Amino acid sequence: MSQASKHVGWCLRKAQKDIAECEKLGKKPKHRGLMKVESDMEEAKRHIAKAEHNLIIAEYLINGGFTDASVGNIFYTMYQCFLSIATKFGYDTGNQTCTLALMEYLKEQGKINLDDKFFKYFKYEDEGDGKGRKKK
């Protein structure tokens, strides 16, 4: 079993625990993992529309000389694309780490074709120094 597969399993269990805890406390169901849901192409399209919007803003900032300010929009452009893929395949994701694990898992399963370089942009080094620096 791959690391991505294990992580997806953990994320699915986490969401179940979170939902059960909310129900126990009488709160609105909310989770920080992954839930298997029905595929929703309309929602997937909305994520793509958000990605396109973020990309337009990033290009505007870059053209205006604000490359540093564009980084967040570029990140969320990619992330919204990942959310669209998750939605297409019938997953509701509650955090970025689970979203990334799902993308890696779907790639391993041959369901998506995505260059590994996109995964590294979202990962952090574990150097034990607590700084959470991006991998190079």
Residue ranges and their predicted role:
Residues 1-136:
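Terminal alpha-helical segments
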